[in-house]
């Protein structure tokens, strides 16, 4: 099931998302480890409780929870700690291909990781997706992009060896609730204490990224 186009109605800004990998570790009799990365790409997790600050927020959350029927339906959320792509290379022309996947590359001295971005905003200007081929900006009339896959389509194929670059001012993460029940009583106590009191347990309303077939 593809993520519905509607977005989570509250702002999950505090702390941002938590990327999580899955690794199998086998420990031998001598204590040596064999590690295997089960997932090459992480799943991002959020705690929606951080978005609840008022009783009106609780009402909005409950209404949305009913609309998506708990864990059944997916939706979009903005990761305020990581929601944009600065101009970077996404591919190289071969004279034939006209489609290129929007990606975000994270680079350190240790290595790099390419994250596939599937849910960019629709705009095709500085507020959304921009594209360059061989260091020349591609006019919006000569390209398009999908807000459900992140695939950029050019009207003409870049010449062999020409670098294709892109930027994205804002993208979303497809998620679902990871619970089928919300503790409204604990949420109310959280709000009454100021939604930040150090002596009050933070409610847990987990959201987890979803992957769809063929992604």
PLM ranges: what are they?
Residues 62-142, 169-215:
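Extended beta-strand solenoid/passenger and fiber regions
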Residues 136-162:
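A surface-exposed beta-strand-loop module
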Residues 162-168:
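Generic detector of short, aliphatic-rich beta-strand segments that form the cores of beta-sheets
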Residues 43, 97, 126, 159-160:
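Generic structural microfeature
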Residues 1-73, 173-195, 200:
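Solvent-exposed edge beta-strands and adjacent loop segments
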Residues 52, 104-107, 153-160, 211:
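Secondary-structure transition/turn motif
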């Amino acid at each position: 099931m593809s993520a519905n186009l509607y977005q989570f109605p509250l702002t999950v800004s505090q702390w941002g998302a938590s990327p999580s990998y899955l690794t199998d570790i086998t420990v031998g009799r001598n204590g040596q480890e064999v590690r295997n990365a089960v997932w090459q790409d992480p799943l991002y997790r959020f705690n929606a409780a951080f978005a609840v600050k008022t009783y009106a927020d609780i009402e909005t959350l409950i209404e949305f929870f009913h609309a998506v029927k708990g864990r059944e339906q997916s939706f979009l959320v903005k990761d305020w700690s990581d929601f944009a792509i600065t101009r970077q290379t996404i591919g190289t022309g071969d004279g034939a291909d006209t489609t290129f996947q929007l990606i975000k590359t994270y680079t350190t001295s240790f290595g790099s990781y390419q994250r596939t971005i599937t849910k960019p905003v629709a705009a095709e200007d500085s507020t959304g997706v921009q594209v360059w081929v061989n260091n020349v900006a591609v006019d919006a009339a000569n390209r398009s992009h999908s807000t459900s896959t992140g695939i950029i389509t050019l009207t003409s194929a870049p010449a062999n060896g020409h670098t294709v670059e892109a930027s994205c001012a804002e993208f979303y993460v497809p998620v679902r609730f990871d619970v089928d029940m919300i503790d409204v009583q604990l949420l109310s106590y959280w709000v009454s204490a100021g939604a930040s009191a150090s002596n009050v347990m933070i409610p847990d309303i987990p959201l987890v990224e979803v992957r769809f077939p063929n992604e």
